[in-house]
Amino acid sequence: MIIGIGSDLIDITRIAKVIERHGERFLDRVFTEAERAKAERRAKKSELVAATYAKRFAAKEACSKALGTGIRQGVWWRDMGVVNLPGGRPTMVLTGGAKTRLDALTPPGMTARIDLSITDEWPLAQAFVVISAVQAAAEQAGATSS
């Protein structure tokens, strides 16, 4: 059962300019430590760093739309983090207000599954999020919130 769907498209150069202008203040406010570590491993090429951050920014926007809140109502940027499953597939881990909102949307006896697709083609980055409620046994096969 689909709980929510969200998508976002962003100009990578916009994120690059914000990083240039606001630096650590922006990065600390929006991204988790794991997201920052992943982006900084690509530091040899600044456009790769900007694209990595832009995809994660778009994923957070898409996830907040799938939650039905946007970035408000107790859902904040760092409450949503992009992580990769062992096979490399991206998903979201929710904490704080985002997790509270997800729990409220998930029917009793079911588990939330978050499917995420992220991509970029300079100068654009895109993310698409589908949040589904699945039976507990199906949780083993996919990504879930933690």
Swiss-Prot record:
SUPFAM superfamilies found in the cross-reference section: 4'-phosphopantetheinyl transferase (SSF56214)
One Pfam family here: ACPS
GO CC terms: cytoplasm
Cofactor: Mg(2+)
Reaction equation(s) it catalyzes: apo-[ACP] + CoA = holo-[ACP] + adenosine 3',5'-bisphosphate + H(+)
Family: Belongs to the P-Pant transferase superfamily. AcpS family.
NCBIfam families per the UniProt record, alphabetical: acpS, pantethn_trn
Name of this chain's protein: Holo-[acyl-carrier-protein] synthase
Naturally occurring in which organism (per UniProt): Rhodopseudomonas palustris (strain TIE-1)
